[in-house]
């Protein structure tokens, strides 16, 4: 004859619980590995600066510097010429 259910029920339940625990541990390990990989990708991404943004910032600074130079030249020229008075009126 065979074994009775009452004899093998505890053994079967223990085996299922062990398999369930192993599956949870495996899944937890996979999630931790994925999180570690994603964290390393974020770290690598944060190290590099965006080249396009750097170029735009450099252009903006260059434009601001050029404008300051133009303004300085304009004020120097105005000071050199002196304050302009009224011009001679032409008689008609």
Curated annotation (Swiss-Prot):
GO molecular function: ribosome binding; translation repressor activity
KO phenotype (gene knockout): Mild slow-growth phenotype in response to reduced iron levels. Displays global translation defects during recovery from stationary phase with translation of most genes reduced more than 4-fold. Ribosomes accumulated at start codons, were depleted from stop codons, and showed codon-specific changes in occupancy.
Record field: compositional bias (Basic and acidic residues): 1-10, 38-72
Function (record text): Ribosome-binding protein involved in ribosome hibernation by associating with translationally inactive ribosomes. Required for translational recovery after starvation from stationary phase. May facilitate rapid translation reactivation by stabilizing the recycling-competent state of inactive ribosomes.
Keyword Transmembrane: no
Coiled-coil residue spans: 17-80
Domain of life: Eukaryota
Keywords, ordered alphabetically: Coiled coil, Cytoplasm, Nucleus
Annotated region described as Disordered, given as residue ranges: 1-92
Principal location: nucleus
InterPro entries: LSO1/2 (IPR054413)
Protein known as: Protein LSO2
Gene of this entry: LSO2
Locations listed in the record: Nucleus; Cytoplasm
Similarity remark: Belongs to the CCDC124 family.
Organism from which the protein derives: Saccharomyces cerevisiae (strain ATCC 204508 / S288c)
Assembly, per entry: Associates with translationally inactive ribosomes in the nonrotated state. LSO2 bridges the decoding sites of the small with the GTPase activating center (GAC) of the large subunit. This position allows accommodation of the DOM34-dependent ribosome recycling system, which splits LSO2-containing ribosomes.
Cellular component terms (Gene Ontology): cytoplasm; nucleus
GO biological process annotation, one example: cellular response to nutrient
Positions of disulphide bridges: none
Upregulating conditions: Constitutively expressed. Expression is not regulated by iron unlike the LSO1 paralog.
